[in-house]
Amino acid sequence: MTIFTKNSVPLRARVETMSAFSLPSVNPSRADSEVILHAKVEAFYYDRFLALRNVYLPIYKNLITTLIGPSGCGKSTLLRCFNRLNDLIPQTRLQGQIIFKGRNIYHPLEDAVVLRRNIGMVFQKPNPFPKSIYNNVAFGLRIQGYRGDIDEIVEHSLRQAILWDEVKNKLKENALSLSGGQQQRLCIARMLAVQPEIILMDEPCSALDPTSTKQIEALIKEIKQQHTIVIVTHNMQQASRISDMTAFFNTEMIEGSRTGELVEYDHTPVIFQNPTREITRQYVNGYFG
């Protein structure tokens, strides 16, 4: 089986069958991003239910990768595999490997808590702690025993999250008093404070109004300079606006149940304007979902 090479961004990375990739030649002018995370998932199960299979997906450093596809195709399941949040669900198991910076994160000796410091998650619904705005951002630093200037990092993180000017005079107020969009940006600031290398986002704008969505999208584009970002979204316009790479997933009937699988993965303009697979074209044009 041919696998993606480490330091290349393929122009036509796609699944021709359910078990193998077909790769064309890579344009050297585009092969300028290294693979920071590489999913090689043969199968993922919830108890006996096969939720996902045959996913071989490289994630490129300092790029925004979106995972798209209809509900139930395994996008969020795969996202949670990237920092082992699925470990918290009883009777789940992964067959395969997920390689982060050369190490299999599912190796028995790998510490999932340490992993999650390097690969953080922003959820669909904002989840600020019932603490002050300041203490929300400082929380992770204190847990890690950080001994530097916490005030400086709190301010810097809030500025990165485009929130500082809105909250600088009320840092002692309860974070739950903020609007939904502000709470989501606070959650991002809280994560940025501990400087993860990869940020996972599971539909981060689905519960937000258009103005807040625009702010979050601007923030995502800004922070990709220092972070690698992977986003699950059902919003095709959002995926086409903000992402560099797009992976399209769909479902296949297997033994009476629908199992998710990767259909096509390429640069975002290719997926939306000239996809290889007809089913990809139908999905991004809204013919099913």
Curated annotation (Swiss-Prot):
Membrane topology term: Peripheral membrane protein
One MF term in the entry's GO annotations: ATP hydrolysis activity
Subcellular location: Cell inner membrane
ABC transporter domain span: 37-276
UniProt GO BP: phosphate ion transmembrane transport
UniProt key word Nucleotide-binding: yes
Name this polypeptide is given: Phosphate import ATP-binding protein PstB 2
Native source organism of the sequence: Trichormus variabilis (strain ATCC 29413 / PCC 7937)
The gene coding this protein: pstB2
